[in-house]
Amino acid sequence: METIFAQSSAFGKAGVAVFRISGPKSLEVLQLLTGKKAFKPRLMYYQQIIAPETKELIDNAMVVYFKLPNSFTGEDVVEIHTHGSKAISIMMINTLLNISDIRLAEAGEFTKRAFLNNKFDLTAAEGIADLINAETIMQHRQAIRQASGRLEELYNSWRSQLLKIISLLEAYIDFPDEDIPDSVLNDVNNTHKNLVNEISNYLNDNRRGELLNSGLKLAIVGPPNTGKSSLLNFLMQRDIAMVSNIAGTTRDIIEGHLDIGGYPIILQDTAGIREESSDIIEQEGIKRAINSAKTADIKIIMFDAKKLDSSINEDITGLIDENTIVIINKIDLIEPSKVFSIEDKYKCLRVSVKNNIALSSILKNIENIAENMAGFTETPYITNQRHRHYLKQALSHLTDFSLDNDLVLATEDIRITARCIGAITGVINVEEILGEIFQNFCIGK
């Protein structure tokens, strides 16, 4: 196995920069850079880092050596903690590149080596990637649960039950003259039935984990000049959308990213929806607004209190569902006692974006819907499409299984099911999918 290195911390100005080296020559490289021969594992040393060829002092650094297998990768690992400057990073990288039999690591290669050395399964490796990319508390909680092995426990439990069925059936394939006892048949059928139900229910999760990973799309829609762009600016706490009294100012979708209650929200301000527009560009904007709302996870439909009754049309009300927040804006311009017909059919929030009236209720409603769609449950979720793909395949073969079929064919259905589950965690030969997973990591991880 080659020795690899990379800067594990971000490149640029910082308090500390961390360089990681992994492989059989790690300790030798550390000795070469410091001139010190003896290093006790897992003990930090304060050492001068000297470029071997030029004898130039690069930095005074903290260094540590991890002896295999007690390291992140399961190999000999060295970490060098220097001051975080671009100049030091460039000098360190160039110095390491000039040492023979050591090369720059590929993206995710340290984590890939850890997986290959049985430090964790593929789901935990993906959890580490999600942890690095997490931007909100809920994304962090999901990632840390996955990185800690919760998904591995679930999938391994299913796979163990499948292997038990295989072992029971293969015993009777080897002895075809023997009748399978009723107790064994009942055991196999009950286990099979339970697994079908568990995996079916698990797949029927409304993509909660994937939504949390990618972010919940929230579209703000409604007639022109209802305050949609002002609401977007309020939620983003900065002016990213142009606000004007002229109808049709917003022509295209304006997007922003927000953290509400720990949930990642992708906000989209859209063109005002009206029926009488003759402007071709505005018509395209309206079309995009409706399409955006139809594909959104959460919708805010916004009306102007002074023009509400005249601005309601089926293009707008047809978008309302259980994950929609209906807002009547500009309530400061009407009598508080005024009642609207739409309030008889839908729960509406009365607000004034301009005067900051009841805006906290909007945030709370968004958070409640997000929690309902992607909030935590006791069982960890499917977090990416790769898992879902293999689970669907597994369920398909599991559903095909029947003891009324030829026993060899029935056993093969269970074997393929177990193989699909194993492909998720990496307990089978999955070299063809490793590149796809680890290429999404950053260099140095």
From Swiss-Prot:
Binding site for GTP: 225-230, 244-250, 269-272
Top-level taxon: Bacteria
Gene3D superfamilies on file: P-loop containing nucleotide triphosphate hydrolases, Probable tRNA modification gtpase trme, domain 1, tRNA modification GTPase MnmE domain 2
Binding positions ((6S)-5-formyl-5,6,7,8-tetrahydrofolate): 20, 79, 119, 445
Sequence positions that bind Mg(2+): 229, 250
GO molecular function, one term: metal ion binding
Location within or outside the cell: Cytoplasm
Any one GO biological process: tRNA methylation
Stretches assigned to the TrmE-type G domain: 215-371
Entry EC no(s): 3.6.-.-
Record's keyword terms, sorted: Cytoplasm, GTP-binding, Hydrolase, Magnesium, Metal-binding, Nucleotide-binding, Potassium, tRNA processing
Residue sites binding K(+) per the record: 225, 244, 246, 249
Recorded GO CC terms: cytoplasm
Keyword tRNA processing annotated: yes
UniProt-listed InterPro entries: G_TrmE, GTP-bd, GTP-bd_TrmE_N, GTPase_MnmE, MnmE_dom2, MnmE_helical, P-loop_NTPase, Small_GTP-bd
Cofactor binding annotation: Binds 1 potassium ion per subunit.
Cofactor(s) in the UniProt record: K(+)
Family under the similarity heading: Belongs to the TRAFAC class TrmE-Era-EngA-EngB-Septin-like GTPase superfamily. TrmE GTPase family.
Role noted for this protein: Exhibits a very high intrinsic GTPase hydrolysis rate. Involved in the addition of a carboxymethylaminomethyl (cmnm) group at the wobble position (U34) of certain tRNAs, forming tRNA-cmnm(5)s(2)U34.
Subunit and partners: Homodimer. Heterotetramer of two MnmE and two MnmG subunits.
Protein name: tRNA modification GTPase MnmE
The organism of origin for this protein: Rickettsia akari (strain Hartford)
Gene name in the database record: mnmE
